[in-house]
Amino acid sequence: MKIPGLRSPHDIVRGLHYFGRMLDKIRLHQRGELPADFHSNLGEGFDKTCVQFLGVPYAEIVEHVKGGASDDETLTWCRWRGRQFTEPDATVWNEFMRKRGWNDAASERLKQRKAEGGFSSREEIQTMFDYIDADEERPLRAQPWLI
């Protein structure tokens, strides 16, 4: 289902994949525009993985975003409040997240999600990010490690 105002997990905010999507979900939820089936997973799944990388509790990020902070302001605040990650740290984070579901511990979950979403025959969906984009009716991004 297409959700206006919700970015792809591939989209990057100041060098980090997924972060902007997490903030979009917070803002959409705050405005009452986030579909109900997303509510139970707020702060869980990839959100939880993201906040663990940042070293800032999800609830604190929610409160910061609710105060009107932009993406850049929120990431600056997270880096001040939480973990002082380096560019190599961000590269490892991005590659881990971007490939999640491709030959790793999340592969079975991806297979299950594809079946639930009616995408079992879509061989080009190789990662969880691919699945999210397909499920939200976005074109898939290139997967250079498969070329």
Q: What residues fall within each predicted segment?
A:
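Amphipathic protein-protein interaction modules
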Residues: 61, 65-119
